[in-house]
Amino acid sequence: VKLVSGDMHYPHGDPPGLTDEKDAMLICQAVPTTDLVIEARLLERAAEIEPRIMPCKVHSHEPLAHDVMRVMLKLPESQRLQFLAGQYLEFLLENGKRRAFSIANAPHDDEFIELHIRHVEGGTFTDFVFDSLKDRTVLRIEAPLGTFTLREESDRPMLFIAGGTGFAPIKGMLEHAFFSGISRPMTLYWGVRSRRDLYLPDLPEEWMAENDNFRFIPVLSEPDADWSGRTGFVHDAVLRDIGNISEYDVYMAGPPIMVTSASEAFEEHGLSRDYMFSDAFEYAAPRGK
């Protein structure tokens, strides 16, 4: 978003990959020091869903990779979470802090809330998730939040670009698109460091087998010796494949440096910012920082 007036700061330092655009800010990390006026592109449907603070219970948790945990949350029996694919929730912690995670399931599949939580060494909350979390633990959340959602009224082909656990909101978006019968061409590029970081490798392959309009292209930045697929930066792989990226709707989720680099590269190749939609997130700083 753009900061129009007021003052704020980033308590953990400027986020990596923060755009150089004048007065740009990441509202998920900024702490206001005065009243703020901001400019943001809002989606009407997302604005119509009022976020709620509610309890939830950990139904199950399982490791998907060496540093990714899938956590399934269950709301009270009488409640269901109304949300749009791609939105996120925040855990309300006892120390007053919050931790945000994207919702990985689609709205039609709402028996549980699925999260993919990456372990950050020294991060208080993720240490708790990986070392101490037990099923049936009761937590408090606020949801749904965010405007990173599908523009279903568009007729343009779609590119989905995920970095690491940025796959989570993209998963929800794609499962919603398949369920809704969207027939536009859809391509997912999933950029990770090594093969083991593709923490649900079979799922996109299943999507390809079931949907003729979907393609999946994994990209490794530090490939294994036996890797024969794509390598390098994920946005470079996209630009090598796509002849005219200006014709696409592009959805990006992952670390700010990835989203910023991709956005700048795509704009240089003719894609208007009006057709770029992103969820850039940074992992919480370790204790003491």
Enumerate the language-model features and the residues they cover.
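Reductase modules of NAD(P)H-dependent flavoproteins
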Residues: 1-36, 185-289
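Short, surface-exposed secondary-structure boundary micro-motifs
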Residues: 4, 41-43, 94, 144
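Short, structured interface segments
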Residues: 25-48, 137-139
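Ferredoxin-reductase
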Residues: 50-138, 155-156, 192-194, 219-223
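Short, conserved phosphate/pyrophosphate- and ester-handling motifs at nucleotide-, phospho-/glycolipid
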Residues: 86, 166, 255
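A short, basic/flexible loop-to-alpha-helix module at the beginning of a structural domain
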Residues: 143-155
